[in-house]
Amino acid sequence: MKPSVVLYKSLPEDLRARLDEHCHVTEINGLTAENIAKHEDVFRQAEGILGSGGKVDAEFLRQAPKLRVASSISVGYDNFDVAALNDRGVLLMHTPTVLTETVADTMMALVLSSARRVVEMAERVKSGEWRGSISSDWFGIDVHHKKLGILGMGRIGLALAQRAHLGFGMPILYNARKHHDEAEQRFDAEYCDLDTLLAESDFLCISLPLTEQTHHLIGREQLAKMKRSAILINAGRGPVVDEQALIAALKDGTLHAAGLDVFEQEPLPVSSELLALRNVVALPHIGSATHETRYGMAKDAVDNLIAALNGKVEKNCVNPR
């Protein structure tokens, strides 16, 4: 008998067919409290769930007593209570490898667009402000040969270092839990403590997961240690940066600019002061959002779920037994 699975994010037709081949699938539109209550009987029988977003905690698990596998179409898993999953023996699968290069592309795009004020300049042209030779108040700053600091040297950090060092001749500084031999050997990356990273980086690129230890890791005190000419890039998790402290630093000149793909609250409220600042490039959490990569993530999530339900957990498991 096929295991029962709740799908809470739609899939491409071929991937849905593959899932149907192996599982009895009930599809809902998001893992919301309303949908969970509406499909109470379905969740009571579910052995697997697959999707992105939503909160999976002890309360949810009480409503899904037969759950064995949760497969997330994402690399981050801060919306999952891993301790609660462990208590219940539920495996958590994610998609950490397929999006590496695409997210690194997005981070490099934020570096370039923030430094050269690409979004702001495009808007000026569209609004008819370009009427002759541009003056210095339209100028940006160079990227090549500037120091790029990476906070969190994982797969994405390494891919970013490759782009920055080989493509733009940028010296690489980094801080992580341990030395990264490949980054040091291939890209001459220099390990340093956080204070040194803050003080010396021309671009500080954050590629960290959200944990209790990383929440508001970058706040007022840390921003004050950065160069006034520095640019902060965050494509990791929004709450790693204290957003109010960042806004203050951008307004008073403590920090030159910021390129952001993640925020403390998503979607970013239209009332956010960040949206009123010309020295901010704000994207709607599109780090992995290309057709090719999102398809690859969905495929990995389907494969992960099917494998785990069949007791074949070889990769992409957050909490292997």
Curated annotation (Swiss-Prot):
Active-site residues per Swiss-Prot or TrEMBL entry: R237, E266, H285 (proton donor)
CC annotations in GO: cytosol; plasma membrane
Cellular location(s): Cytoplasm
Superkingdom of the source species: Bacteria
Entry-linked SUPFAM superfamilies: Formate/glycerate dehydrogenase catalytic domain-like, NAD(P)-binding Rossmann-fold domains
Keyword terms of this UniProt record: Cytoplasm, NAD, NADP, Oxidoreductase
Pfam name, any one: 2-Hacid_dh
Main location: cytoplasm
Known EC number: 1.1.1.79, 1.1.1.81
Disulfide-linked positions: none
InterPro entries the record matches: D-isomer_2-hydroxyacid_DH (IPR050223), D-isomer_2_OHA_DH_cat_dom (IPR006139), D-isomer_DH_CS (IPR029753), D-isomer_DH_NAD-bd (IPR006140), Glyo/OHPyrv_Rdtase_B (IPR023756), NAD(P)-bd_dom_sf (IPR036291)
Reactions listed under catalytic activity: glycolate + NADP(+) = glyoxylate + NADPH + H(+); (R)-glycerate + NAD(+) = 3-hydroxypyruvate + NADH + H(+); (R)-glycerate + NADP(+) = 3-hydroxypyruvate + NADPH + H(+)
Matches recorded under PANTHER family: 2-HYDROXYACID DEHYDROGENASE-RELATED, GLYOXYLATE_HYDROXYPYRUVATE REDUCTASE B
Function: Catalyzes the NADPH-dependent reduction of glyoxylate and hydroxypyruvate into glycolate and glycerate, respectively.
Assembly notes: Homodimer.
Name of this protein: Glyoxylate/hydroxypyruvate reductase B
Highest classification ranks of the organism: Bacteria, Pseudomonadati, Pseudomonadota, Gammaproteobacteria, Enterobacterales
